[in-house]
Amino acid sequence: MTSYIKSGLYLIGFMTLSTLASAQFSTDSKSPVTGSADDVDYRPNLTIFSGQVDVRQGDVRILSDKMRVHTTNGASGSDSIDGAHKIEAIGNFYYLTPDQEVRGHQGIYLKSTETFTVTGDVVLLQGDGNVVTGDRLVYNLTDGTAIVNGTCKGRKCGSKGRVNILLKNTSN
């Protein structure tokens, strides 16, 4: 029984961390954070959400097959939300807003660098029709910069493995 209560409390704490991590992404960071998964496995310093993970805040939605929240023990020896240092969303990763969709194999948030990295067949779709594809996208939450990398360098690769960009004509 205590395990279920602790898991429930940790889920609330995780959602609070998600609010902080996604505040830069969400247009409504004061909205409540909701989440669901088929299973939650709580361990010291690690909580694993498995099976159709769905986290929402305002108009932002994150989907994945599995999500791992890594923490460091707090001063009192119990897991503290302040100690969460890494969030991994693994398998069929989607980051969705009304104006943008990012998808890839996985997304990783690192508190130490304030970065959000998406890897594996990354596709960034913008509402205006622009598309960027690559193998890796790194978004810096502090300064708002983004870097997209491919797996192949040079013209000999063609478009396979390189960063590809499609910009829609905005002129009338």
Annotate each predicted stretch with a short phrase.
Residues 1-172:
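Mature-chain termini and adjacent capping regions
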